[in-house]
């Protein structure tokens, strides 16, 4: 904890020399621990996840409020690519940045939050090193979560609204709320059509359509209750 505090005291720019501010040990002792200390990462992560699940699921049982599993990914950019860096950073790659609209060099992580009744906790931060797809990473998260004690929801962007992920979360009691890419194929009333074509025929007066305003300027998104339930198992690439 003293290490974490010393890092944040300097505004995310903490160095080993700052350990002396919050620790009674000499900075070289702390540095030695960071460089050579041994601990079981998987056991630590398992214990942390277990405590978070216990707290969030207990809150859901006592309050009756839904659990939200929130997934997103981000890139920690680095200024110099490996061809220019004197000491290339381990596990850094070029990733497609939707924010910048181009390839960005750095570390990409998938973050998973669990939230219920105003309590939001970080369940997992997984480094995306391209040995496993982001779709598979999130599917594994869905598989390891216990079944939700109440009706709950998985929140994501259009990258994660795939049939496999939605099915995995549905098996654990989580319905998906997420954006759809316009080229997704849906089957309303058993009729095959693109999401873009279906959207053109939606009307505000339709009893199955609920307008949801998202903080994106003048943009509004429509949510069709019938479709979201019907197509949990029928969404295809």
Describe each model-derived feature in a short phrase:
Residues 16-20, 65-79, 112, 154-161, ...:
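Short, conserved catalytic/metal-binding motifs centered on acidic residues
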Residues 1-44, 48-49:
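Gly/serine-rich nucleotide phosphate-binding loop at the start of the catalytic core
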Residues 131, 175-237:
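An anionic, glycine-rich sequence signature occurring as long contiguous blocks
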Residues 36-119, 217, 225-227:
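Active-site-proximal, Lys/Arg-enriched surface segment
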Residues 78-80, 122, 164, 187-188, ...:
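Short helix/loop capping segments that flank catalytic or ligand/cofactor-binding pockets
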